[in-house]
Amino acid sequence: MNGEYRTKKSVTVKDEATVSQNDNSIAVDPRLDFAVGRMGIPYKDWGLPKTDWVRNPVNGGVFMPKKHVFSKAEFESGMGGKAYHDGWAPGSAMNIQYLSVRDAKLLYAECLANDGDLAGAMAQVNDIRRRAALDVNIVKNADGTPAANYKVAEYPTSHAAFSNKDVCIKAIRMERKLELAMEGQRWFDLARWGGDYMAAELKAYVDYEKQYIPKFAGATYLPASKTMFPVPDQQILDMGNDESGQPYLVQPGPWK
């Protein structure tokens, strides 16, 4: 949780002696509660999270992963890896989704934006946001009411993302973060967007966590030059040179 799903400062109260409370009047993107377990919000069909669901909130915070955790119904049917549920680290036999239509559409949006078709790119983004706003995609309480103040809307055509390439690409990248959170995509996105971008995102994450989690107090920042592994020397040799005698692969400066 680094503030991306909401527009106001977090007011979550954390205290190991009490149940954490959220101010659910703050508008949040509905995808937050599909990706992150929050106190006071139904956790799939397991009910409301309790304080003891998090072993040490002061050390790790009060939020929990959600997308790849099996539901109670899946657990009871044996789909969740029933043989491995005992102990402090339950196992799961649930499949991991490697590629989805959502992922493909947002990758396509990136391609369109890079080729200059900003309207086409934002149409893909708006498709994703329109789906996120559907009632079926809203986490609800037992009585059928929304579990929080959910808000997500399409980008209007007057938005700068429809006319400014940099703004458009920024919007697409944000949408990937919101839509694909906790699905194992993030590192690969940061890697292909470049070392400088990755370093900036990691710094923003650490700076935010330092406000709440003591273990981040002494955290240092990863320089952009160290966000990527060096290219294997043998791979550079195997690729050979082009017609002008220049190598197809070149070792990045920090690793030469």
What is each stretch, according to the model?
Residues M1-K256:
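Acidic/polar-rich alpha-helix caps and helix-coil junctions
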